[in-house]
Amino acid sequence: MLDTSIQALINKWQKYLVLQRNYSNHTVISYNNDLKHFLEFMNYYNSEFVTINHIKTADIRLIRSWLAKRHCDNFTTSSISRGLSAVKNFYRFLEKTTQLNSHIIFSIKSPKKTKLLPKALSEDDVVISLEHIEEYGNVKWVELRNKALLVLIYASGLRISEALSITKLHLQNLEFIRIIGKGSKERIIPWLPIAKNLITQYLEILPYKLGDNEPIFRGKQGKKLQPPVFNRELIKLKHFYGLPQHLTAHSFRHSFASHLLEHGADLRSIQELLGHKSLSTTQNYTKTSIKHLEAVYTTAYPIKK
């Protein structure tokens, strides 16, 4: 049980992450869980209920003990790093909103991550997936939703969270999808006709009325579709057709990039289409025109027809 003043700070921090930093709900929930774990450990470490003063005066020994505890509890290096990033983020917020200055936590480096290469699917596996994903859903509109969503991800390289945020407003531009990705960075991706046509067909039979700003991909109860629900459909597909274990919604984003590269697209254009943080929107379109991006996309992409 947290002190009410601490909980109030956490609530303000969460609002800040959503409204000011444009963090996704998934990231905010993960960060909140990491901070909660840290504060629970602090409570155990100090043998008393955590106060604001405990948080402000946490020393390097406490923080390293918490990281060691996570390691002993078999958290992955990635999870430990994310946890430390979450807590640092909270302390950075405290610096902005309280009298806290230059906390010791910022001197602690994240553990080195093992770099894993992203796993793409073969083009044959992608074709099998796109041809058979409609077999799952039990209701026609759900089956068409699954296919439209999967084609959209593979045809545009969107993150699953980005794809699930598509609204009717995105469909009004006949040529491009304008996406606000991580860190509020904007990128523009050419619409592939097959993706847009499937989405249009899906919306024609969707049994729920939606406003222009509402996400178009819905669950069976009419609420916004969540990533785990869609990935469960992919698990069924994967098991039935003997597809690779690493097949997930995100693997189609990796496949988008890999297949473009294999078909002659240059790395820089692919990075721009993916919206990687190393390239800002301004850099994207001062150095490479939208016309060039479209040309690269339409000449190199394997399912353009």
Curated annotation (Swiss-Prot):
It is found in: Cytoplasm. Residues 116-298 form the Tyr recombinase domain. The active site is at 159, 182, 250, 253, 276, 285 (o-(3'-phospho-dna)-tyrosine intermediate). GO terms for molecular function: DNA binding; tyrosine-based site-specific recombinase activity. GO terms for cellular component: cytoplasm. Its main location: cytoplasm. GO terms for biological process: cell division; chromosome segregation; DNA transposition. It holds the Pfam family Phage_int_SAM_1. Belongs to the 'phage' integrase family. XerC subfamily. Site-specific tyrosine recombinase, which acts by catalyzing the cutting and rejoining of the recombining DNA molecules. The XerC-XerD complex is essential to convert dimers of the bacterial chromosome into monomers to permit their segregation at cell division. It also contributes to the segregational stability of plasmids. PANTHER family: PHAGE INTEGRASE-RELATED (PTHR30349), TYROSINE RECOMBINASE XERD (PTHR30349:SF90). Forms a cyclic heterotetrameric complex composed of two molecules of XerC and two molecules of XerD. This is Tyrosine recombinase XerC. The gene is xerC.
